[in-house]
From Swiss-Prot:
EC number annotated for this UniProt entry: 1.2.1.41
Originating gene: proA
UniProt name for this protein: Gamma-glutamyl phosphate reductase
Described function: Catalyzes the NADPH-dependent reduction of L-glutamate 5-phosphate into L-glutamate 5-semialdehyde and phosphate. The product spontaneously undergoes cyclization to form 1-pyrroline-5-carboxylate.
Biological pathway: Amino-acid biosynthesis; L-proline biosynthesis; L-glutamate 5-semialdehyde from L-glutamate: step 2/2
Catalytic activity of the protein: L-glutamate 5-semialdehyde + phosphate + NADP(+) = L-glutamyl 5-phosphate + NADPH + H(+)
Family from the record: Belongs to the gamma-glutamyl phosphate reductase family.
InterPro entries reported for this sequence: Ald_DH/histidinol_DH, Ald_DH_C, Ald_DH_N, Aldehyde_DH_dom, G-glutamylP_reductase_CS, Glu-5-SA_DH, GPR_dom
Amino acid sequence: MSNNEFLNKLGEQAKKASYALASLTGQQKTALLRCIASKLTDAKANIIAANQQDVEQAKANGLSEAMIDRLLLDEPRLLSVIADIDNVIGLTDPVGSEIDSRLLDNGLRLSRRRVPLGVIGVIYEARPNVTVDIAVLALKTGNAVILRGGKETLASNKALCKVIRSAMAEQGLPEDCVQLIDNPDRSLVSGLLKLDKYVDMIVPRGGQNLQRLCAEQATIPVILGGIGICHLFVDVQADLDKAVAVIENAKVQRPTVCNALDTVLVHQTNAASFIPALCQQLATKGVSFYGCAQTQAVMANNEQQIMQATDESYSTEWLSLTLGIKVVGSLEEAVAHIRQYSSGHSESILTDNIHTASEFMNAVDSAAVYVNASTRFTDGGEFGLGAEVAVSTQKLHARGPMGLEALTTYKWLAWGDYTVRG
């Protein structure tokens, strides 16, 4: 079977399965998700063993620590993934809800109702937790899904999908509601992007190269995002003692994810006192620094080395314990820097001045903008959405963390009384 024939078969099966999903009641979907959670718990040892194969292979292939951290699915992370299923079960199912309705002058009673998108294709890299997150959100909203994970997590993804598909069968549903492309041939990605006869939306979760490939080749609507060049501005009226803790959380807690902090902008009034204190604390956590000339000047007599920041470094999503630092003279300069280098993901300001905070929130055009909070909150779970499909940095059809509602569309329903148009 050729790749094209394989993909068409996959798409046809997914489309057929989506019709069965679309007719499920909320109770049936809840039973399915509970079954998946139970089976994942029972298969915990097998899943972790499969993931360990991926980790060992990644180490043998010389992959970076950041990449290995991304693909790791140990017991705490797996239990967190399973807990997220329970969170999704508790969320309101948007499918079938009425958005609005009205009686028209022509006699029609018109309403908009939320319905599943149909079939979703998700292309992602070294994160096996995405396999479960996506499948659960898709099933909750009545969508079939075609998954194409990275070759680095092939064993993990196969183990996870086997469990999910067994739950589908146990609940009397088509296993093809969730399908995995387990062939690492990259041409299959290009083929999936053109499977518009069957697939309704593509969600790429990966780096710039994957995002660019999807944007250039897809004949299907694509949700772009997941690249997080995130900024935090320490205003002249910030509480500097509290600011260090927020920045440490944003940078250090989990540096390999897209909502981790990349660049700190510091008002020049506080630079001489704040930057040395910040660098001293973060250095104890293994953070290295790129800084502007003013940053290097205020750190000249300190032991922490500050490498010269460049356009390239400011344009980098570090995904590691590396932080850019830039001194700015005003809120306007901070906003200008963010507008130039941000990926549109998450930005934050630390300030006790409510007017400055409001100006920042109005001026910065990113998916999530914070006042006195870490950028790490940009997450479906933290936003109360349950697990997320992705974090969209575009403005159509979804923006920011994509939860259940982002996996639906609507259709117009019109009731008449043998009504004709005049």
